């Protein structure tokens, strides 16, 4: 098991004015998995991602990544741990417009004081894999949204993280670009990259090999694709969402 979330609670606020964002959340993710997280707004999806990403700490419970309990990390070690173990892809790309695409991609390796020779080698490898060789000398303002997201993915993967975390990665993209991006995610996953993705799109979720549904801060339901066609799997995801959103109305 690469990622283990055990009996995790997350409470915001104090005294009488508290909100329980996660309540006894349990989840395990194995090597080579591509997992999508779905649920209504406020269900706890983003909270879970933030806790795994070490942007926040649990109130109770344990999260382990590659056997290491995240709550034992000291503040001074968190940035390095995050840089070495995780890659991040967000809806709004988070690329720096004042830097070339190449420098955006290389930033995690620069921060890690990696040797220039290795940086160049990794840059060439990831650029070829993502088909962005011709974008490296350009700036983010000169390229499309889909291309910016590829730059962000290259930056996320260049340090060879154990886990790629994606929060609504196609949220700012049109449907054709979204499909291309999800095909890319699947291809990356097939090269043994573990991906955990929060999404509201059943189309995007159908590219994952497992979908977990969160309701009221708990794991409510999960489905595996198995040998199913993507169309049938997508329908099953949509049906599960309808049930999830209909319960308690």
Range-by-range predicted roles:
Residues 1-2, 230:
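Generic alpha-helical segment signature
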Residues 2-3, 8-210, 214:
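ABC family nucleotide-binding domain
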Residues 218-242:
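Conserved beta-strand-loop-alpha-helix hinge in the C-terminal portion
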């Amino acid at each position: 098991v690469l990622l283990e979330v055990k009996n995790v609670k997350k409470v915001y606020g104090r005294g009488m004015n508290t909100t329980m964002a996660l309540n006894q959340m349990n989840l395990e993710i194995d090597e080579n998995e591509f997992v999508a997280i779905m649920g209504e707004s406020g269900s706890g999806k983003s909270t879970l991602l933030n806790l795994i990403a070490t942007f926040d700490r649990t109130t109770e419970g344990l999260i382990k990544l590659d056997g290491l309990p995240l709550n034992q990390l000291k503040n001074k070690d968190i940035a390095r741990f995050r840089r070495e173990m995780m890659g991040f892809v967000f809806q709004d790309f988070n690329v720096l417009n004042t830097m070339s695409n190449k420098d955006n991609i290389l930033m995690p390796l620069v921060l890690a004081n990696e040797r220039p020779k290795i940086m160049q080698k990794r840059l060439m490898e990831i650029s070829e894999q993502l088909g962005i060789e011709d974008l490296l000398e350009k700036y983010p303002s000169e390229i499309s949204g889909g291309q910016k997201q590829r730059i962000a993915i290259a930056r996320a993967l260049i340090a060879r993280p154990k886990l790629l975390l994606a929060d609504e990665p196609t949220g700012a993209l049109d449907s054709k670009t979204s499909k291309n991006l999800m095909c890319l995610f699947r291809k990356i996953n097939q090269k043994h990259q573990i991906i955990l993705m929060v999404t509201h799109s059943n189309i995007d979720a159908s590219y994952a090999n497992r979908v977990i549904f969160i309701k009221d801060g708990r794991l409510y339901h999960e489905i595996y694709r198995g040998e199913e066609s993507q169309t049938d799997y997508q329908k099953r995801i949509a049906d599960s969402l309808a049930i999830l959103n209909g319960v308690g109305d």
